[in-house]
Amino acid sequence: MFFLKNLKRTRRNPAAPRQNHLTLTVGILLTASASFAEDRITLNTKDDGYRGIWYMNRPLKSVYKYKYSGGLGTYCAKHKPFAVCCDTVNKTFFCYGGTSKANNRSLIHMVSYYDHEKKVVPRPTILLDKKTGDAHDNPVISVDAKGHIWIFSTSHGTDRPSYIHRSRKPYDIDAFELVPATRLQDGNQVAINNFSYFQAWNLPQKGFVCFFTKYGWGADRALAFITSSDGVEWSER
């Protein structure tokens, strides 16, 4: 509707420069495209319970069946942290790899908290559908100095994208927004859209320090770290 209204207005004003018409139209289309892309990723809906993903790895020809398997909603050991205690609001915020009622091997990224005063947990927020059954894609969590909750959605390798989300309000899990994060590469800002085995730490008055694995950075698997004061623009690896 906004696009159509502006088209009508420009038609009524023949004296307006043609270049301005094009700029306005392109700007609206780009904004709509970005919003659509975010809406397809960020769900911001509520679940009616807690269901962690079940996952198995490397079938074996023995009585053990798999190298490992079971409920792996907070897998793996390299991912940190899954929970952050915030004394300011007396709550511990946490994330985990959830799943749907229909399929316990479909990975959904979930966010919630434990209220230490009331000793209860709310209905968790469904952040996004990772479109995989691989628990290596489980998320990790961080909380910045202003109380905003950050979720880093990892990927196992390069076949799937990674995402960074931030809560719209401090200490609140009801709504998250996709962060258009970038990092320095050869003096230019490039999109951050893939990372594995992520660890995210927020330091007072300094911001984020993150450690992770990146595939294809001069080796099959490279260990790296990046920093950021705001979570949007990140340093070079």
Where is each model-derived feature located?
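Short linear sequence elements within intrinsically disordered, low-complexity coil regions
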Residues: 7-8, 25-26, 59, 119
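Bacterial N-terminal signal peptides
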Residues: 23-32
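Generic detector of N-terminal low-structure segments
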Residues: 4-5, 22, 38
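N-terminal secretory signal peptides that target proteins for export/translocation
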Residues: 1-18
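Extracellular, repeat-based ectodomains that mediate carbohydrate processing or recognition
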Residues: 38-237
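Short stretches within intrinsically disordered, low-complexity N-terminal or propeptide regions
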Residues: 16-18, 34-36, 83
